[in-house]
A protein has these predicted regions:
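Conserved nucleotidyltransferase catalytic core and NTase-mimicking acidic/glycine-rich helix/loop elements
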Residues: 39-166
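Alpha-helix capping at helix-to-loop junctions
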Residues: 17, 24-31, 55-62, 66
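Short acidic (Asp/Glu) and glycine-rich catalytic loops that position anionic groups and cofactors
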Residues: 1-2, 32, 85-88
Length: 166
């Protein structure tokens, strides 16, 4: 990302979930940290997280419908969705006052908290899809549907958080 310092306030508001992830994981290699003191308004972060989740759900559903018979393409979609889904889980946990060392750990913690065994079984497949860009025959469709369900579940928990704040 190549962004001017003057553009930061607008960009942070427009892409609150993305910048939340940047704030969590940034490492300054040279010079001063342009994000020192940056705070994202909670209500903006909640609204943007809701948008990101809805977009992810819609995109994954479209992939499933349009390319569901092509498992190699589903595996790529799973790999591509892993980062945003993990980041969404990390943001939700952060909004709930919990911290995790990585977005991957945040997603695992979230899934464990739901008690959904199918989702827990899907987690290693997500990593496998990211690393190998392919999954064993007959697996990708179920994993992708599980990702949609996880994203919907994160959205439901986010909605409860929003309601609790009103």
């Amino acid at each position: 990302m190549f962004i001017l310092e003057a553009e930061l306030p607008s960009a942070i508001t427009a892409f609150a979930e993305k910048f939340s992830d940047i704030l969590r994981r940034r490492k300054v290699l040279f010079g001063s940290d342009p994000f020192v003191g940056v705070k994202i308004l909670r209500k903006i972060l909640i609204a943007r997280l809701d948008q990101v989740l809805l977009n992810l759900i819609l995109r994954l559903r479209e992939v499933y419908v349009m390319r569901g018979l092509r498992e190699e393409q589903l595996a790529i979609a799973i790999a591509d969705a892993a980062g945003p889904l993990r980041s969404c889980a990390a943001t939700l946990l952060e909004l709930e006052g919990q911290k995790e060392n990585s977005p991957k750990a945040a997603l695992e913690k979230y899934v464990k908290s739901t008690g959904e065994s199918a989702w827990l079984e899907a987690l290693p497949r997500i990593s496998e899809a990211r690393e190998q860009r392919i999954l064993p025959p007959g697996v990708a469709g179920a994993v992708l549907l599980n990702l949609i369900d996880v994203a919907k579940s994160i959205g439901s928990r986010l909605e409860k958080l929003r309601e609790a704040e009103c």
